[in-house]
Amino acid sequence: MVDTNKLRGVIAENGKTQADVAEMIGVTQKTFYMRMSKGVFGSDEIQVMIDNLHIQNPMDIFFAKKVT
């Protein structure tokens, strides 16, 4: 499960928008927003975001465990 708040923070820190990241990973904005709401991305998409957003600790963002 993706920690979407941390991902949004990294996107903003890099001066990007969610629309920019959608284009970066090759999906429509609608698809990106849907994946953000579900907290699920494919491994290829995750790798592109790690590389392009210079994410230092991807485990904290992309493999976050939600406690309920």
Identify the residue ranges that each predicted region occupies.
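Key DNA-contacting residues within the recognition helix of helix-turn-helix
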Residues: 8, 33-34, 62
